[in-house]
Every structure is written in structure tokens, then in C-alpha cells.
């Protein structure tokens, strides 16, 4: 299907799902969003199918209670109130507010769940979320409260609370009542139709949004780590064959090969690294002890093998997060194509949480490498070329 989000300059319209590059533009370059006609049609089809289908059926969260209370029927006159109740009862977070960038990413993720056309929500909900994103209206969302096993219930409830005109938002640098900010922007609070209260609160969008931002930061860190590692080897005047293509092609890991390629690109034209064939392979060395390191220390020489797994993990994290953000992480799933509503557990967050645990390990490894490289720089007895702690003079006076 055609990409559901576009703006006047963005080539995203040609894609069939949002990419990390597009997310970067929206989050860090404030690229605006609009909903395409095809997208609006998809939302309307899903909503109208559910409206008809749910008339005489028992469907979780529409005419039943929530969680263990699903065994209890909700009478027709209380259906709308049920949707407001789940929002107000779950907006119970604690702790510091999530940074605005993470909340914006979470709203984009929730919007994309709705744009799959599997939630049965009214199109006005998607339009209002889009207005929040474009106008820089950021819901106040406390950081603590949910574990993700039943979706990011508490955090999403705080987002939902602002969509119905309640709670607080950050706007133009200030924390304010939502109602006044909506009025100032000419926006109307969302009115519930069938299941929008449950649909906004039920899913992985907050952890996915946080994951997307963290992944973007981690990718930047990795690129800096590669550049810094090349510079370290230039300082040490290392032999450059550790980053050579034949050596790294001998090991079949994509990450290792890519890191080595990036290092070769960084170092191209440098006069600071040495060629082993020019010095050690020329048959002229007769000394018993070599003055220059035949092999650099691990923290300089094993960069492709250390950052390679980090690169591979970032690739896998991107795959998982982009799959998740382009998924319907809702329950139940409303499917106009098969004319049915399916109950399951697409709100469950293990895909994202597993990947974020792995991402933490990867970033830790990256930081450990940086620490070892700093240790090399600071200790003159290790590097043999710099004064202690890289101080230029009066080293004995610098305690």
C-alpha cells in the first residue's frame, strides 16, 4: 500500500513504510507530516467495518471490561464512558517526565499502528496525533509505571489523556494545561467513538519510540567511535594491515567487514599510519629488539572485531524497531480484509525489550573500548610517545 504519511518535500510518499532515515528527519529536523488520501480511506474502512461488525458481538474492550474484568459485559449506555475510564484510570505514572523527543517518537509510533488499518479507530484520532506532532505539542508522560507486558499502558494513557483535552502538555518550552493549548491552536479534544481509549493505551509505542531515539544516538556514537579509533592509530603510527580487506574478509561477519571498510575510508590519504610492507617486509631489519610496535595493542588493533558486533547489533535493532513501528501492536486486531476481529497479544513488548537489552550491551562494549583507548593515551609507559596524562610540561607538578 502507498505510504500513509507525506509532506510537500518529503520523498517518503514513494515508500510503503517509514524508515529510520525518515524518522530521523521527523524527530531531529522537524519534518512535518500530513496524512494521504489513501491513508484516510484505509482508516475509514477499518472504522466502518468495526462499527457494523461490533453491533451484536462480544468484543474485548468494546463491550467488556479490561484485563481480568473481561468476563464482565458492559451495557450499551456505558460503552463510551468505558473508553474514557481506561485512560483516566491508567494515567497514574510517577517520576520525571520523559524527554519530549521520546514522547514525540512514541506518538509517531502510535500513529503508525493506527495507519495499518487494523485498529478500527476514527480518522479524527490520527489527524489529532498528527497535529500534536507537527505543532510541537508534547504530552506530559511520567517515566515510570509500565513494564510493557500488556503494552505501555500507563505512558500511553498519559498521551491519550491529552488527546481528550485533559492532563498537561509541554508547549513552546512550558508545561501547561492541555485544554488551553488545544484552544490556542484551534484544536478540539477527541471524542470517543468505539474503542479509541483502549486502542491508544494498548501497545508498544512508547518503548518503540524510545528505542528509535536511542538507536539513532547509538549509531552516531558508533560512527564517532570508528573515527576516534582511526585517529588513535594515527597517533600511534600503527601498521594499517589490521584494517585491510583481505584480513577482514577472512572472517565472515558483515559488521567486522563494514567497520574495517569505514576505517579504510577514514584513513585514506593519511601519512600517519605505516605500511608493513614498506618497513618490516623489506629485509632490512637486523636489530634484536624493535623500537616500533610490531603489532599495536588490542584497543587499537582489534577495532573491527570489537565494533563489528556493535554494528551488527545496531542493524538488527533497526530491523526489529522498524518492523515494530510498521506493525499493528493493538488488541484485538480489526481486519476489514477478512471481515473479522482477532483477539491475541500483539501489545506484548518482548521484541523491543529483548533488542534494547542487546543494544545496552553493544553501547557498553563501545564505551569500554573508548575507556581502554583513553588509558592508552594517558599512560606514557604504554604508548611510549606521549607525556604522562598528555600534559605538555611540568608533568611532575600536575597531581
Question: Could you say what each language-model-derived stretch is?
Answer:
Residues 40-58, 128-143, 185-190, 195, ...:
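Short, hydrophobic/aliphatic alpha-helical segments
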Residues 58-71, 143-162, 346-370:
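Conserved phosphate/anionic-ligand binding catalytic regions in large, soluble enzymes, centered on
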Amino acid at each position: 500500500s502507498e505510504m500513509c504519511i507525506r509532506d510537500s518535500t518529503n520523498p517518503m510518499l514513494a515508500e510503503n513504510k517509514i524508515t529510520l532515515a525518515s524518522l530521523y528527519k521527523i524527530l531531529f529536523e522537524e519534518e512535518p507530516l500530513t496524512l494521504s488520501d489513501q491513508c484516510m480511506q484505509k482508516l475509514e474502512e477499518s472504522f466502518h467495518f468495526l462499527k457494523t461488525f461490533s453491533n451484536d458481538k462480544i468484543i474485548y474492550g468494546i463491550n467488556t471490561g479490561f484485563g481480568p474484568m473481561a468476563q464482565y459485559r458492559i451495557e450499551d449506555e456505558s460503552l463510551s464512558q468505558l473508553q474514557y475510564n481506561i485512560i483516566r484510570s491508567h494515567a497514574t505514572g510517577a517520576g520525571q517526565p520523559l524527554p519530549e523527543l521520546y514522547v514525540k517518537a512514541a506518538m509517531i509510533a502510535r500513529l503508525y499502528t493506527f495507519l495499518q488499518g487494523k485498529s478500527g479507530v476514527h480518522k479524527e484520532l490520527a489527524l489529532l496525533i498528527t497535529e500534536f506532532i507537527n505543532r510541537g505539542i508534547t504530552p506530559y508522560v511520567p517515566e515510570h509505571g509500565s513494564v510493557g507486558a500488556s503494552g505501555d499502558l500507563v505512558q500511553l494513557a498519559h498521551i491519550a489523556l491529552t488527546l481528550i483535552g485533559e492532563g498537561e502538555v509541554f508547549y513552546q518550552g512550558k508545561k501547561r494545561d492541555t485544554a488551553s493549548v488545544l484552544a490556542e491552536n484551534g484544536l478540539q479534544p477527541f471524542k470517543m467513538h468505539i474503542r479509541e481509549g483502549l486502542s491508544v493505551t494498548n501497545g508498544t509505542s512508547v518503548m518503540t519510540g524510545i528505542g528509535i531515539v536511542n538507536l539513532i544516538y547509538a549509531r552516531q556514537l558508533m560512527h564517532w567511535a570508528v573515527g576516534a579509533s582511526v585517529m588513535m592509530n594515527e597517533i600511534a603510527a600503527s601498521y594499517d594491515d589490521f584494517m585491510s580487506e583481505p584480513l577482514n574478509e577472512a572472517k565472515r561477519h558483515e559488521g567486522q567487514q563494514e567497520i574495517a571498510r569505514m576505517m579504510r575510508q577514514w584513513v585514506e590519504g593519511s601519512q600517519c599510519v605505516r605500511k608493513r610492507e614498506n618497513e618490516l617486509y623489506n629485509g632490512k631489519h637486523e636489530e634484536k629488539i624493535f623500537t616500533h610496535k610490531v603489532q599495536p595493542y588490542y584497543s587499537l588493533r582489534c577495532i573491527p572485531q570489537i565494533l563489528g558486533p556493535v554494528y551488527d547489533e545496531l542493524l538488527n535493532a533497526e530491523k526489529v524497531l522498524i518492523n515494530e513501528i510498521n506493525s499493528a501492536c493493538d488488541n484485538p486486531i480489526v481486519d476489514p480484509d477478512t471481515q473479522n476481529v482477532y483477539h491475541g497479544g500483539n501489545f506484548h513488548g518482548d521484541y523491543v525489550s529483548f533488542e534494547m537489552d542487546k543494544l545496552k550491551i553493544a553501547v557498553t562494549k563501545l564505551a569500554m573500548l573508548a575507556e581502554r583507548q583513553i588509558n592508552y593515551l594517558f599512560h606514557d609507559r604504554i604508548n611510549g610517545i606521549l607525556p604522562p596524562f598528555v600534559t605538555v610540561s611540568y608533568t611532575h607538578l600536575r597531581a
